């Protein structure tokens, strides 16, 4: 006859110290990782705001240029923008050439060359009074007139805006558009 001895063991309750230490380490690693993401997200949010400000300003300035007639009066054709800057619109006597700020082509995209010196009446500095850090934007543009000298059929505007000052480095914003009859 076989006797089986069974001993009633009480079930374990709670966690061992090793399990608690492992859980604590995992929790701390997660908290440190999240803590590092907060400053990075704040910086990216600031940069996105700055890029958006430059783009909105570039769009407003380009809209004012596009609102001018193709055969604008004056020699050379010009207008005064909403910020009281005199803006040249290109000389019809020099068709099919880049007039104004120098342009470079990178990856088949025409961009304003901000390494070159500014060209009078084809550039200005804009101080953003709504920005508490006092950011200044360097605004430059080039115009390419298509026509035969006396008759203008189209104008291509390449406008670039670059932030000067502030925290960090920001790529310039470039808008390229054409208006024709």
What kind of region is each of these model predictions?
Residues 1, 20-21, 65, 178:
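Detector for methionine-enriched segments
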Residues 49-52, 56-181:
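Low-complexity, Gly/Pro-rich coil/beta segments used as flexible assembly/activation regions
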Residues 4-7, 23, 170:
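Exposed boundary/loop context
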Residues 15-59:
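Aliphatic-rich helix starts adjacent to a transmembrane/signal segment
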């Amino acid at each position: 006859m076989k006797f089986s001895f069974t001993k009633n063991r009480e079930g374990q309750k709670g966690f061992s110290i090793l399990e608690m230490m492992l859980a604590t380490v995992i929790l701390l690693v997660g908290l440190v990782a999240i803590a590092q993401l907060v400053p990075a997200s704040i910086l990216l949010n600031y940069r996105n705001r700055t890029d958006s400000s430059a783009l909105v300003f570039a769009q407003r300035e380009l809209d004012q240029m596009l609102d001018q007639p193709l055969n604008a009066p004056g020699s050379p054709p010009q207008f005064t923008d909403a910020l009281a800057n005199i803006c040249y619109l290109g000389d019809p006597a020099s068709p099919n050439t880049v007039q104004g700020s120098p342009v470079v082509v990178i990856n088949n995209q025409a961009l304003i060359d901000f390494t070159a010196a500014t060209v009078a009446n084809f550039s200005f500095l804009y101080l953003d009074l709504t920005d508490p850090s006092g950011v200044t934007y360097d605004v430059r543009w080039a115009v390419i007139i298509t026509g035969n000298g006396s008759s203008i059929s189209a104008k291509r505007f390449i406008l670039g805006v670059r932030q000067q000052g502030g925290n960090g480095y920001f790529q310039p914003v470039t808008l390229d558009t054409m208006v024709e009859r």
